[in-house]
């Protein structure tokens, strides 16, 4: 049986291996050809909005969508994804750290995550597409 571990220790070990980025740096990387990937649940995207240009990928299929050898990969995902920055974000930057580590294990050496997640991006005043309102609102 594997030894018991707490998630905080696993998260700290994972983050020590990543070159995590602040919101402004993530925006610069995306403008320079990096790939921003939103792994938040649909409910949070509907509540808070989205980052323009970010690819939306459910966390449970992330590896298949960003693996260039997978028949289930996203359109446009090719061998270049192994070398380019891939910046994942969740709501506050926890799940995205673990997800970036999974992508690095696939060989995506530029995989990392956004420190503070979507909430930090929004607090930094970077562009956000607002959530729908009125009849088009999800709630």
Describe each model-derived feature in a short phrase.
Residues 1-35, 42-85, 94-139:
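Rhodanese-like catalytic fold shared by cysteine-dependent sulfurtransferases
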